């Protein structure tokens, strides 16, 4: 399926920061150009984080904005964001930028010397001036056009919901499909949040026992982006979508509006714990990974398989195969820097290959998983720095993958696309035998 559509900057920055967004877009090019001329820096060691850990520093009151994401009509056009037709628009909640800024100001060390490292101060500088620091802050608190492109595609595609095509029959012995989602360079994680909303909407249509499962891994180089933006966004969206205990304000059209959430009034830590327990009961789980891409990162996404308990009894893994899952990798604005395209491409194909070995090439319980895939949204070219779609596609093909255009974005600015990346037949044969 191929769509052609466009977004303006005003569709993105609901905090009244469209001008700042444009300036930060220019900073991406400057940062990538500087990064490509310098020798590679030591990357941060990848680390896994839990939702509980990341929400521990959440303040007692959280301000949030609401973003309405349109789906596509059958003719490939974006629906009206004010449409009341079922499924036409999905509302996604995100923590307000000014709320993140307020927390960073509270955490910054005012007595630190200029040369001393103060992460909060560095991140605050990035928010206030639009400065990007390679390997420290690369715009993760902002919402970019490509993330919206990807979110619209997610809510439009009928087979991305927690239910597989042809598996919606409650009498099906194999049951509904299990989904795994990995978002790289997640930032505000809008595409994943849109997918979770879609999953929960489908859950309401069927008994819980037939609701499928959703396992999400959200990844960002910066652990503070995960802590201050990504995890709070997950919490807000699940809380509003699934809980009858918490309501949100509505605008004059009856749509969700911006607001404030008083966590202390609603139970504080007990509310957070109860919400995470509800996620588990709904077969929804979230994990988070910070740090740089590479072999260690891949091991956190898909840990090496330990010997099975049955092996010591003389049984083989073929006698105890895993239950299949569908894998979808999501990524947006991750190919702007020529110095990181190779590592990013290796990471995408590495995750696809790991999943293929475990759930597609190997024996599984029930139906085999379909081939894993990745959806990568990017600008066609990042002027002046060499990054962009063409270089990424060349790297995908060089490493044994293949790609095709799913979405072609046409507007007054730089062209944007969403690519689907899969393993080539030769790559799949190689992966199955390793």
Predicted regions, residues:
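S-adenosylmethionine-dependent methyltransferases
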Residues: 1-434
């Amino acid at each position: 399926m191929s769509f052609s559509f466009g977004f303006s900057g005003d569709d993105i920055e609901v905090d009244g920061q469209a001008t700042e967004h444009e300036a930060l877009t220019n900073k991406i090019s400057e940062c990538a150009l500087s990064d490509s001329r310098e020798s590679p820096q030591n990357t941060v060691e990848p680390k896994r984080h839990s939702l509980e850990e990341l929400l521990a520093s959440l303040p007692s009151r959280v301000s949030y904005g609401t973003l309405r994401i349109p789906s596509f009509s059958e003719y490939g056009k974006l629906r009206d964001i004010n449409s009341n037709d079922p499924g036409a628009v999905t509302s996604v909640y995100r923590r307000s930028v000014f709320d993140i800024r307020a927390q960073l100001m509270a955490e910054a060390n005012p007595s630190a010397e200029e040369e001393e490292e103060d992460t909060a101060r560095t991140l605050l500088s990035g928010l206030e001036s639009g400065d990007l620091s390679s390997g420290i802050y690369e715009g993760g608190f902002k919402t970019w056009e490509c993330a919206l492109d990807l979110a619209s595609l997610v809510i439009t595609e009928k087979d991305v919901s927690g239910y597989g095509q042809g598996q919606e029959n409650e009498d099906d012995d194999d049951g509904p499909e299990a989904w795994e989602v990995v978002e790289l360079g997640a930032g505000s994680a809008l595409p994943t949040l849109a997918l979770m909303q879609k999953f929960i909407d489908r859950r309401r249509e069927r008994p819980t026992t037939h609701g499928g499962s959703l396992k999400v891994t959200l990844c960002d180089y910066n652990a503070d982006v995960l802590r201050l933006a990504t995890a709070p966004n997950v919490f807000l969206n699940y809380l509003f979508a699934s809980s009858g205990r918490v309501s949100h304000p509505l605008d004059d059209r009856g749509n969700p509006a911006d607001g404030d959430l008083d966590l202390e009034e609603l139970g504080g830590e007990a509310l957070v714990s109860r919400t995470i327990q509800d996620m588990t009961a709904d077969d929804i789980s979230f994990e988070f990974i910070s740090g740089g891409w590479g072999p260690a990162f891949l091991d956190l996404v898909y840990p090496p398989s330990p010997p099975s308990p049955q092996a010591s009894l003389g049984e083989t893994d073929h006698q105890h195969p895993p239950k299949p899952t569908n894998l979808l990798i999501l990524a947006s604005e991750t190919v702007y820097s020529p110095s990181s395209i190779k590592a990013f491409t290796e990471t995408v194909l590495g995750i696809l290959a790991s999943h293929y070995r475990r759930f597609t090439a190997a024996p599984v319980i029930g139906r085999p998983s379909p081939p894993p895939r990745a959806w990568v949204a990017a600008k066609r070219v990042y002027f002046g720095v060499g990054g962009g779609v063409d270089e990424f596609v060349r790297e995908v093909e060089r490493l044994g993958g293949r790609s095709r255009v799913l979405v072609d974005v046409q507007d007054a600015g730089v062209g944007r696309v969403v690519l689907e990346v899969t393993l080539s037949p030769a790559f799949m044969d190689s992966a199955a035998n390793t």
